[in-house]
């Protein structure tokens, strides 16, 4: 009999062994229980060596590093870019549309990686990101930037999702969160490097060069991953672990099949629903009659109607459900998704320093997460441990959101939130994957990500509404009489805000207005904390170490 490890060693030496155990091959890789994309990755895992496995880990780490660095750079630049178009107040609106679409699209991407393959999904998302970065680098107005940012964020979330799915394919459940957490450690570097890089581009060149440079870098680190995976898939075909079958469908039949399989109607309806319901909270301040404006009312009504149609479509009409409701009946999955959906929270600083404060919670999360992933067996109790840190960090921001508070104190609160987040992120992902088979890992990760995006978009909508409705009035009230006429211009232009020197009446008014609205945002965030506890309570208490000892590994082949 030819064992999987022997086959892997032989194939790595370009020797194609003769595989006689047809029954084993059929049960492992050609089972009807697995979709084509899952079969392909299980076949690849059966033929590669440990060296190739670790090389792939390293290359995926490089992809994550460049991607996280780009996120840090563009997040730091975003307020200044919207301000350059004199639309700084629309920052939340830009993020809401992007967050909703990216979250909803991951379920469609889950279908792509399961039906077509992991690499096909990764390559598609890479193409989306590159096109979006080119659009960002060449945009001439706010409308073009909104479109580019929406496309970019969809591609970014999709790429990270594909990396997570591939890491899940390459690991046992017991060791998965170690690799997930390690793959998130580039945040440690991007926290410090990202804002500084953004500052250098913004000060010495412009934001357009930043996006162009990162488009080239992202392609450079992604291509080796694609080449290795395609090469190993070819090896698995030669070894007999994978049999490629033709669908037998015509071109039109293939288009129809994929439109149904990816439930395009469902994704359009749910994206439209959340976008139309949440966007008015951020843009109502620009409407002529506020909430009484016709198009604001129409957006809310159409959004609710789209939501109702989506539920009816998914329940009674959709041949393939966009949102697999059967998974939402599992308390561990729904609890983890709700937890991820509940999580949210800079002072007028330089670009670099503001970025450090903004990213400090991600930094502490990245440092602690690998250790938590290593020791987490009963993940439910580990998640409980994150609640005090999250509550303390968020609550302390209420008194600390004052102009005279040191930046160090604000940063400490973000570190505390990051510690809590590290528990939640590690344990939450582990929770959703612990109760499904390899076949369903991509889908439950997509659902988990969708809930996070919806929660983030709700948070952005609330924050955007408070920002756009409270800040202008506070700014007007605090500005000296001779500057009140410029209140609207100051509100929309961040560079103009920073041009006023410390100690001037205008600068004091701006800082005071920011502190007031941010303090109210933090109070709203603290009110969400009871939902965190409730979300964890309903999890099943699964010990994943004992589970794998009793039931065997979730994945197969030469894995970590």
UniProtKB/Swiss-Prot annotation:
What triggers production of this protein? Expression is induced during iron deprivation.
Q: Spell out where the chain crosses the membrane.
A: 53-73, 90-110, 115-135, 146-166, 177-194, 211-231, 264-284, 291-311, 331-351, 354-374, 379-399, 407-427, 441-461, 522-542
Q: Which GO terms describe its cellular component?
A: plasma membrane
Q: How does it sit in the membrane?
A: Multi-pass membrane protein
GO MF entry, a single one: transmembrane transporter activity
Please give the Pfam families that the UniProt record associates with this protein: MFS_1 (PF07690)
- UniProt-annotated glycosylation sites, renumbered to this chain: 29, 404
Q: What is its main location?
A: membrane
- Report the InterPro entries cross-referenced here: MFS, MFS_trans_sf
Q: Does the keyword DNA-binding apply?
A: no
- List where in the cell it is found: Membrane
Q: What does this protein do?
A: Major facilitator transporter involved in siderophore transport.
Similarity comment: Belongs to the major facilitator superfamily.
Put simply, this protein is called MFS siderochrome iron transporter 1
The record lists the organism as Ajellomyces capsulatus (Darling's disease fungus)
């Amino acid at each position: 009999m030819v064992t999987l490890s022997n086959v892997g060693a032989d194939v790595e030496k370009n020797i194609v062994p003769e595989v006689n155990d047809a029954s084993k091959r059929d049960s492992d890789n050609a089972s009807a229980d697995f979709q084509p994309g899952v079969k392909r990755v299980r076949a690849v895992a059966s033929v590669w060596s440990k060296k190739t496995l670790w090389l792939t880990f390293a290359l995926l780490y490089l992809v994550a590093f460049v991607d996280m660095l780009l996120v840090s750079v563009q997040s730091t630049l975003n307020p200044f870019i919207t301000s350059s178009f004199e639309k700084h107040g629309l920052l939340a609106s830009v993020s809401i549309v992007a967050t909703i679409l990216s979250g909803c699209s991951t379920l469609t991407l889950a279908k792509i990686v399961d039906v077509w393959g992991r690499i096909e999904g990764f390559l598609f998302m890479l193409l989306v990101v590159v096109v979006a970065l080119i659009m960002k680098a060449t945009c001439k107005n706010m409308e073009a930037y909104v479109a580019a940012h929406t496309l970019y964020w969809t591609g970014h979330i999709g790429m990270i999702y594909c990396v997570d799915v591939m890491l899940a394919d390459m690991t046992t459940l017991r060791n998965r969160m170690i690799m997930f957490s390690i793959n998130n450690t580039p945040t440690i570097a991007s926290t410090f490097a990202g804002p500084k890089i953004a500052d250098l581009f913004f000060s010495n060149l412009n934001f357009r060069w930043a996006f162009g440079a990162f488009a080239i870098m992202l392609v450079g680190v992604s291509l080796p991953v694609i080449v290795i995976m395609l090469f190993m898939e070819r090896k698995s075909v030669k070894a007999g672990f994978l049999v490629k079958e033709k669908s037998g469908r015509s071109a039109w039949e293939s288009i129809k099949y994929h439109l149904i399989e990816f439930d395009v109607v469902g994704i359009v309806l749910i994206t439209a629903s959340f976008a139309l319901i949440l966007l008015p909270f951020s843009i109502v301040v620009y409407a002529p009659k506020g909430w009484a404006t016709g198009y604001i009312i129409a957006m809310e009504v159409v959004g609710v109607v789209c939501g109702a149609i989506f539920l009816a479509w998914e329940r009674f009409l959709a041949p393939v459900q966009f949102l697999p409701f059967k998974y939402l009946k599992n308390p561990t999955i729904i609890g983890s998704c709700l937890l991820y959906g509940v999580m949210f929270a800079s002072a007028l600083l330089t670009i670099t320093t503001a970025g450090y404060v903004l990213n400090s919670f991600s930094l502490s999360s990245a440092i602690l997460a690998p250790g938590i992933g290593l020791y987490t067996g009963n993940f439910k109790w580990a998640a409980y441990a994150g609640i005090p840190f999250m509550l303390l960090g968020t609550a302390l921001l209420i008194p600390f959101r004052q102009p005279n508070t040191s930046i160090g104190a604000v940063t400490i609160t973000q570190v505390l939130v990051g510690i809590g987040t590290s528990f939640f992120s590690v344990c939450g992902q582990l929770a959703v994957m612990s109760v499904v088979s390899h076949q369903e890992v991509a889908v439950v990760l997509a659902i988990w990500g969708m809930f996070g995006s919806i929660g983030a978009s709700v948070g952005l909508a609330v924050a955007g509404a408070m920002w756009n409705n409270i800040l202008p009035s506070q700014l007007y009230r605090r500005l000296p009489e001779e500057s009140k006429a410029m209140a609207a211009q100051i509100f929309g232009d961040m560079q103009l805000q920073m041009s006023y020197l410390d100690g001037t009446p205008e600068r004091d008014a701006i800082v005071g207005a920011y502190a007031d609205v941010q303090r109210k945002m933090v109070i709203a965030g603290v009110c969400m904390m009871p939902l965190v506890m409730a979300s964890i309570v309903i999890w099943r208490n699964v010990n994943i170490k004992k589970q794998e000892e009793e039931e065997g590994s979730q994945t197969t082949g030469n894995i970590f």
